[in-house]
Amino acid sequence: MKKIILTIGCPGSGKSTWAREFIAKNPGFYNINRDDYRQSIMAHEERDEYKYTKKKEGIVTGMQFDTAKSILYGGDSVKGVIISDTNLNPERRLAWETFAKEYGWKVEHKVFDVPWTELVKRNSKRGTKAVPIDVLRSMYKSMREYLGLPVYNGTPGKPKAVIFDVDGTLAKMNGRGPYDLEKCDTDVINPMVVELSKMYALMGYQIVVVSGRESGTKEDPTKYYRMTRKWVEDIAGVPLVMQCQREQGDTRKDDVVKEEIFWKHIAPHFDVKLAIDDRTQVVEMWRRIGVECWQVASGDF
């Protein structure tokens, strides 16, 4: 049975590279790509010159299906076609499924699951093929949905809440390094962020503090948790209702730790409306899982 292979993945995830290599090793397969048609029908030199319209996209879709049909009817030497697009739109995948069913062909998915940080790095090096970061973020969200990973759409019926980070957000380090937690009680407040937390509390929001700080030492696994809580409540005066922190000995990246904390301890109990953070990797994590996030300062570290 002849195949229609749909690549599934964000821009920069390696779909086109894989298609080229696959076709080189598997005679009888052919590649059909929307971007190629977009560039061709408008006679553009570069792909980023293309301006999306419903009419032009309809033409591209028609060309894709007509080409696929012509190729697949091309005799026994033809084994299949690769549709090397993102294919993150469920309606487009359904259209190919329907098309294949009508003619008795088989649809397969080739999935390219690339971490967000790697996608951003690759996107920055793609030149005219790069997509705006908000577009990449939207596509990554669609990829999560395709993979069955959770995307946050609120928790109706639970208390509304705002999440605040500590280091670089509520607190500014005062003569210590980020891992010198023995001195974390000497931090100074970040006044406008602390005021914001109090304003939201007065408006009826629950304040949840989430920190990437390790919670303690081997000898005292909650030492830094207690020091942090005391600073947040007594020094900053933040009216928090919950504090979550990295477990002692957990060396994973901040965005991984905080996302896990969110799904396990926060999402089931609060209707989270906003997160306030400073570190870019964490800010992007909040946004890509569906939580609005305000970034306090430039934090690309």
Curated annotation (Swiss-Prot):
Coiled coil: none annotated. One of its GO terms (biological process) is DNA repair. Its EC number is 2.7.1.78, 3.1.3.34. GO terms for molecular function: ATP binding; ATP-dependent polydeoxyribonucleotide 5'-hydroxyl-kinase activity; deoxynucleotide 3'-phosphatase activity. The keyword Nucleotidyltransferase does not apply. Keywords: ATP-binding, DNA damage, DNA repair, Evasion of bacteria-mediated translation shutoff by virus, Host-virus interaction, Hydrolase, Kinase, Nucleotide-binding, Transferase. Pfam families: AAA_33, HAD_PNKP. Optimum pH is 6. It catalyses: a 5'-end dephospho-2'-deoxyribonucleoside-DNA + ATP = a 5'-end 5'-phospho-2'-deoxyribonucleoside-DNA + ADP + H(+); a 2'-deoxyribonucleoside 3'-phosphate + H2O = a 2'-deoxyribonucleoside + phosphate. SUPFAM superfamilies: HAD-like, P-loop containing nucleoside triphosphate hydrolases. It comes from the Viruses. Its cofactor is Mg(2+). InterPro entries: HAD-like_sf, HAD_PNKP, HAD_sf, P-loop_NTPase, PNKP_C_HAD. Homotetramer. Acts as a 5'-hydroxyl kinase, a 3'-phosphatase and a 2',3'-cyclic phosphodiesterase. Catalyzes the transfer of the terminal phosphate of ATP to the 5'-hydroxyl termini of ribo- and deoxyribonucleotides. In the presence of ADP the enzyme also catalyzes an exchange reaction. In the exchange reaction, an excess ADP causes the enzyme to transfer the 5' terminal phosphate from phosphorylated DNA to ADP. Involved in countering a host defense mechanism which activates T4-induced anticodon nuclease and shuts off viral translation. This is Polynucleotide kinase. It comes from Enterobacteria phage T4.
